[in-house]
Amino acid sequence: MTLSSEREAAKAAFLSANGFGDVRRESLGGDASTRAYERLHRGEQSYIFMDQPPSLETAPCPPDASPAERAALGYNALARLAAGRVDAFVACAGWLNAQGLSAPKVLAADPAAGLAVLEDLGDDLYARLIEAGTDEAPLYDAAIDGLLAIHAAPTPKVLRYDGSTWPLLTYDDLALKTAHDIFVEWQPRFRDISFDAAALAEWEAIWAPIRAKGEADATVFCHRDYHAENLIWLPERDGAARVGMLDFQDAVLAHPAWDLSMLLHDARRTVSPEREAACLDRYLAARPELDRTAFLAGYHALGALNIIRILGIFARLVTRDGKPRYADFIPRLWVYLDVCFADPALAELKAWFDRYVPVETRR
């Protein structure tokens, strides 16, 4: 029996054991990871079948690993990623549902086997609806309300749901450093530039206090991939539950500005300055305890870090992985970064880019 046939047999056995042996199966393909999805049909009902084969990705970050141990384990441990673990998805989904939010309900799961049957939230992705002409204002308002609900909730250090347990680790100094250093590792291979020891020393000196502030304020559940291709519009539901949330298994404890940046610095679609301002105003109006100037400084600093991280990832996808389509998204990210650089608190970072990253390479 081949590996693929063994996997198919395991999937069929799982479905049968959990009351889904009689469904019609429709392949939906995969996502950017090793996961694959099917839609299961039974009469008028449909469900989503998630298949995350074990051992295809390296291990997630152990909660107590030292920096040296994380470096030895590799990128997932350095960045504090879940390595596609189904138990992470199940535990995060359960926590989000407990807050009254619309993560897919887990109907059956075998985390060790990497299999789960989920509630089907439909196909109305924010990105798809907006591209088709749907008014984006209520969608983004609801997305902000979703973040407000998440940020208002007490966040445990360990998530537990239906037998699955998952540590909610902090987006700490090392994970943040790993994020911004992707840029200086991969941008030179994408554009003909180089960073000498002096440039890299300046880079680290600029980022160290930003990372320290980011870790100190890491107090909320952070979806980590909260953008228009991972949000589903559910207008028949109420309030923040109108936002269906996907792809949250890499959640961490982080600064509340991180997911705002993911939403408003969307790499795949342009979020206008007017929409960004309206969303930030909505968020801050609901949180009068925050100092607006201080919060926006954090938003611009961590937003810049996030944008720079994505620039590095896309450079890696183009140069190492042979995926040239990601180059199409890069100019948009530079526009977002220029907006962040307008914050006087980022004058040093802007000056670094002006010295070492020529404008003609920012494309």
Curated annotation (Swiss-Prot):
An example Gene Ontology molecular-function term: kinase activity
Function: Sugar kinase that catalyzes the ATP-dependent phosphorylation of N-acetylmuramate (MurNAc) and N-acetylglucosamine (GlcNAc) at its C1 hydroxyl group, leading to MurNAc alpha-1P and GlcNAc alpha-1P, respectively. Is likely involved in peptidoglycan recycling as part of a cell wall recycling pathway that bypasses de novo biosynthesis of the peptidoglycan precursor UDP-MurNAc. Is able to complement the fosfomycin sensitivity phenotype of a P.putida mutant lacking amgK.
Family: Belongs to the kinase AmgK family.
NCBIfam families: MurGlcNAcKinAmgK
Catalytic activity: N-acetyl-D-muramate + ATP = N-acetyl-alpha-D-muramate 1-phosphate + ADP + H(+); N-acetyl-D-glucosamine + ATP = N-acetyl-alpha-D-glucosamine 1-phosphate + ADP + H(+)
Keyword Transit peptide: no
Alphabetical UniProt keywords: ATP-binding, Carbohydrate metabolism, Cell shape, Cell wall biogenesis/degradation, Kinase, Nucleotide-binding, Peptidoglycan synthesis, Transferase
Pfam families, per database record: APH
EC number: 2.7.1.221
Organism: Caulobacter vibrioides (strain ATCC 19089 / CIP 103742 / CB 15) (Caulobacter crescentus)
Domain of life: Bacteria
This protein's pathway: Cell wall biogenesis; peptidoglycan recycling
Protein name per the record: N-acetylmuramate/N-acetylglucosamine kinase
InterPro entries: Aminoglycoside_PTrfase, Kinase-like_dom_sf
GO biological process, one term: regulation of cell shape
Keyword Kinase attributed: yes
SUPFAM superfamilies: Protein kinase-like (PK-like)
